[in-house]
A protein has these predicted regions:
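Juxtamembrane helix-loop transition sites at the ends of transmembrane segments
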Residues: 29-32, 87, 139-142
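Extracytoplasmic
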Residues: 2-72, 90, 117
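Flexible, solvent-exposed extracytoplasmic
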Residues: 41, 72-77, 91-221
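Aromatic/His-enriched, Gly/Pro-containing loop or helix-boundary segments
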Residues: 27, 79-94
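Generic signal for short, ordered secondary-structure residues
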Residues: 19, 75-76, 84
């Protein structure tokens, strides 16, 4: 009986799974091979993101294997980020790519070679802006990014203002308006420590400033 069961299992299984479907453990542990572009980017030990424009950004798992990527694949999409991709990233909006701290682009050249290009205009991990534009809806918010000057401006949906708790700032003003901050040219804000669940920053400024962080806050993630 055992022999019959074994024969039945093997004969049926081989109809659906061939020997070619089995992979050596070393290939499973390292499913992707780093390109020369990947190796060049990995020499930079700072904290940044990479945009691989040689493939579908939101269906690509290989780039995330080597770098912090602005893309990647997951069956459960983050709605807001997917909208940001559809409305802005897919259109190569450079200001949005700068805002996402995209320091390197992986692109192809005329010869079909894959190359790494450094983006000199990336905003970094965090920065101060001197203007906050308040809009009335999520639609206005995503469309405002069409013309946003991300190094000096930020956009906030009016419904999100109450999340800013500090008094005497935009949190205490219940009208839809824009807010200006007197930029301190000597002010700094920098990322000191990067852990999976905790990011530590340090800032120094003589005046009240509005900081923008190049991160997605996902409470349960």
């Amino acid at each position: 009986l055992a022999v019959l069961i074994l024969f039945d299992l093997v004969s049926v299984d081989k109809k659906y799974v061939s020997e070619d479907d089995f992979k050596p453990s070393r290939k499973v542990e390292k499913p992707f091979i780093a390109s020369e572009a990947d190796k060049l980017i990995q020499k930079d030990k700072s904290h940044y993101r990479v945009g691989n424009f040689t493939t579908d950004l939101m269906q690509d798992g290989s780039t995330s294997f080597f770098h912090q990527s602005i893309g990647g694949y997951h069956a459960a999409k983050m709605g807001r980020y997917q909208e940001l991709f559809d409305f802005q990233i897919a259109k190569n909006n450079l200001e949005v790519l700068n805002m996402l701290n995209t320091k390197y682009f992986i692109v192809g050249n005329d010869k079909g070679e894959i190359q790494a290009q450094q983006n000199p205009d990336t905003n970094g991990n965090a920065w101060f802006v001197n203007r906050v534009n308040v809009v009335k809806s999520a639609n206005e918010e995503i469309l405002a990014l069409d013309s946003l000057q991300s190094k000096s401006e930020a956009v906030i949906n009016f419904s999100e203002i109450d999340k800013f708790k500090k008094p005497n700032t935009i949190a205490s003003k219940k009208i839809v308006s824009n807010y200006l901050f007197d930029r301190d040219s000597t002010s700094i804000i920098e990322l000191l420590k990067y852990d999976v669940t905790k990011l530590t920053y340090q800032s120094k400024t003589e005046k009240e400033q509005f900081a923008v962080f190049s991160e997605i806050y996902y409470k349960n993630g």
